[in-house]
């Protein structure tokens, strides 16, 4: 079914560099010690929890998505993009709850004729693509770092997403010949978000950091896969998933 895999290098890819969550010797830190290490490092790097969380997300996905051929690289980036996009929406909801306001307050809500609900708005676009530490900024920066000389047209993806609301084409990535993921972004989001949210909450903490956790995960995966999948293609796959999944109502997927 799939045509491109990490293959024999999967074992190496599944071993992120040493971090406070993975001490020398390869064993896991006791949970209390891990959280204490994160709390201490936050004094120097406020993003440390999100960075460690990103590594943990990639490690878990590599384990979950591996079969006898390895890990299908396009599927990994589609999944990470879907999670990163929805994390932007979930982050805004989480921040609203902390402030004691309606979780829908940050959004412009669009209801379509097919009975579905979608979420838009400047705060959502900011977390996804417009802020200095947006998902797009971090992922595109990694792509350039690993040699990408061109980037996808993010505005075109936004426009195509909006025009597909209420149709069967919503959330269907534009095909890149030879680089199809194994499932649609919504399928990855539906199955993976509930499984990964607890560890993201634990390691990243503040809802503001949830999208960054997945953006750092994209960076981590891009570094691992740069010799298997061109960084600009990895970035395109991720953003083709992230933008529409930032708009969806998770409970209806």
Residue ranges, per PLM feature:
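Solvent-exposed interaction surfaces and binding hotspots enriched for charged
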Residues: 2-253
């Amino acid at each position: 079914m799939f045509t491109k895999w990490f293959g024999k290098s999967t074992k190496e890819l599944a071993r992120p560099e040493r971090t406070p969550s993975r001490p020398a010797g390869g064993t896991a830190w006791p949970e209390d010690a891990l959280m204490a290490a994160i709390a201490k490092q936050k004094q120097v790097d406020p993003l440390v929890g999100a960075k460690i969380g990103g590594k943990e997300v990639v490690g878990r996905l590599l384990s979950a998505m591996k079969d006898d051929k390895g890990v299908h690289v396009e599927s990994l980036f589609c999944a990470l993009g879907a999670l990163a996009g929805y994390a932007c929406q979930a982050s805004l909801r989480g921040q609203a709850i902390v402030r004691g306001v309606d979780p829908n307050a940050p959004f412009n809500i669009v209801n379509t004729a097919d009975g579905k609900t979608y979420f838009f708005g400047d705060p959502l676009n900011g977390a996804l693509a417009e802020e200095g530490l947006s998902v797009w900024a971090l992922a595109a920066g990694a792509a350039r770092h690993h040699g990408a000389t061109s980037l996808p047209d993010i505005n075109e993806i936004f426009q195509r997403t909006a025009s597909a609301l209420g149709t069967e084409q919503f959330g269907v990535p534009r095909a890149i010949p030879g680089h199809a993921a194994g499932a649609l972004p919504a399928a990855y989001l539906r199955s993976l978000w509930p499984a990964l949210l607890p560890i993201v909450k634990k390691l990243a903490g503040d809802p503001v950091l949830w999208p960054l956790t997945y953006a750092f995960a994209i960076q981590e995966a891009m570094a691992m896969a740069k010799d298997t999948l061109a960084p600009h293609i990895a970035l395109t796959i991720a953003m083709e998933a992230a933008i529409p999944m930032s708009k969806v109502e998770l409970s209806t997927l």
